[in-house]
Amino acid sequence: VYKYYMKILAVQNRMGIGDTVIFLPFIKTISEKYNVPINLLVRDNSKAGQYLDETSYINQILILERNNNFNGRHDGLIGAVNLIKDLKDKNFDKIFIFNSSLRFNLIAKFAGIKEIYQYPLFKKKNQHIINTAKKFIEDSINTKIFDDPKIHIDKNTIENTIFKFKIKREDTNIILGIGGSGPTKRIPAKT
C-alpha cells in the first residue's frame, strides 16, 4: 500500500515505446525506495498511456508536448516556461531526470522542485542506455534492486483480447514484442 505524502516525477524523454519500457525497472525501483507511485513525463510517441495505465507504481503519465516542427507547447523558450508552470502546479518534491540535459535541470529548479537527481550534465556522448540508468539509480538512491521490464495488464483486458482475436490458449502466441534499435538499447538475455 502506497502512502501519498511525497510526489516524485521521473523524466524519460526518449522517443518510442521500447525506450520507455527499458526504463521501467528503474522507475519501479524509485517507487519501491520511497513507497509512492511515480509520475512519469514522457513524449507522446512513447504511447505510455496506452500500456502503463494498469501499472501500480505509475501514478500519472504527463505528456511532454514537443514535436519535429518545434512548435509544440513545450518547445523553445516559451515551451520551457509552459513546462515550468505545468510542473510547478503539480508540486513535485523530487525529480529523476534520465538524461544529461541542462534544459530539464533548469526547468526543474524554476518549477521549485527541491530534490533534483539527474545524469551528469554534458556527459551525453557514448552513454549506454541501460548501464547509465542503472548507475544513476544506484548512485542516487543507493540501491541495486532491479527487475526486468514488465507491463501490467488487467485480466479483463487480457480476456477480451483473447476473445476478440480468437486466441487459442494451447497455441504459442506472441502478443507484444518491444525492442530497441541500437546496440546500447538491447537488453541482455540475463539481467
Question: Which residue stretches match the model-derived regions?
Answer:
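Catalytic machinery of carbohydrate-active enzymes
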Residues: 1-191
